[in-house]
A protein has these predicted regions:
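Conserved catalytic core of the tyrosine transesterase superfamily
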Residues: 1-238
Length: 238
């Protein structure tokens, strides 16, 4: 994997601190373990963009903080940049990689254990509304996306191959948000079963959900796990 060469490079030429070097080495070893165990890949030139996206999704699925995920992505980008310059590989699979947005942590009154229990227990009905509500809570909690981004998601914005969603952020800027395997599975089941074709979350007339309705949905479920009176989608962005 040329890891030793890379470590020597950042140590002697880049003169990174011992702490930074250790972090890089740890991140890369974790990635190598993932691709070897999951895909039996032992050569960096065999790594694809999709494979890296799967790795990132697995990190997010294990509730790793977005700041930690971003650091690991940075380590991988530096590693592949070195491989390209050193002519060890011909292509760089990290070029189109976008780091997940770093968002605020959950407020103390929305404990992680409580959120986990919300998904584990039968709080959501086995109906269109129940499945829709669960997806809304999932997307807010696991991606940190904004309310305006969520209500504007269309089925065409969901990249099932790379496990990511394209959203329109502030000032009409597009960004790609990685999603976990479980969330992608729930999305696929919801879209296919209810034959969703345009807006992911829509009213009966096909128009996107109103912001106030999303607020009511979030408040309904947070009331089951929190005693705080004022609750909103922002409380789920961690």
């Amino acid at each position: 994997m040329y890891l030793e060469d890379f470590i020597n490079y950042i140590k002697s030429e880049k003169r990174f601190s011992n702490h930074t070097i250790t972090s890089y080495e740890t991140d890369l070893n974790q990635f190598f373990n993932f691709i070897q165990l999951e895909y039996q890949i032992t050569k960096p030139q065999d790594v694809s963009f999709k494979l890296i996206r799967n790795w990132i999704s697995s990190l997010l699925e294990n509730n790793l903080k977005s700041t930690s995920v971003n650091r690991k992505i940075s380590s991988l980008k530096s590693y592949y940049k070195f491989l390209i310059v050193s002519n060890y590989v011909d292509t760089n699979p990290t070029l189109k990689l976008i780091s997940p947005k770093s968002s605020k942590r959950l407020p103390v009154f929305v404990e992680k254990d409580n959120m986990d229990s919300l998904f584990d227990k039968d709080f959501f009905e086995d109906s269109y509304e129940g499945k829709r509500d669960k997806l809304i809570i999932e997307l807010f909690y696991f991606t940190g996306m904004r309310l305006s981004e969520l209500i504007n998601i269309k089925t065409s914005n969901i990249d099932k191959v790379n496990s990511q969603i394209k959203v329109i952020g502030k000032r009409n800027k597009e960004r790609l948000i990685p999603i976990t395997f479980n969330t992608l599975k729930d999305l696929n089941e919801f879209i296919n079963f209810y034959e969703i074709e345009n807006f992911l979350f829509a009213e009966g007339n096909g128009k996107k959900l109103y912001s106030k309705k999303v607020y009511r949905i979030v408040n309904k479920y947070l009331a089951k796990i929190s005693s705080i009176k004022k609750k909103s989608p922002h409380d789920l962005r961690h």
